[in-house]
């Protein structure tokens, strides 16, 4: 709990500094939170009633964001904390995300091979206007096949608004 308070205080200080810089350097700050009745990610149910806060800063196409999810209906339920570093210009975008899923006994700063609760994912994509494509691949962390080899799980997304 003490570490959580420190993390919250540090995030508030960073956001306060980013807000001050906005007028001078065009740094954009994002602070938001969503409440969802179910947390579903890529077709997988990851939780019930949850709050999902976001903090982010962006400057000239480069962005750093923190996103989390914790169940409100079950305090011992699923928790997730993600950090994303991304760059975009025109329709092109590229990024790296560190997903952390609370597995009960797995601590956030545990990065040991074959026992971490982190998954590291790279993404690249392009928005053509009427159609956007995005490719995601896990490249490190907890993403292994049954035989222990790296799985490099991948996900492709096509988006055509109508």
Where would I find each of the regions flagged by the language model?
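Outer-membrane beta-barrel proteins
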Residues: 20-162
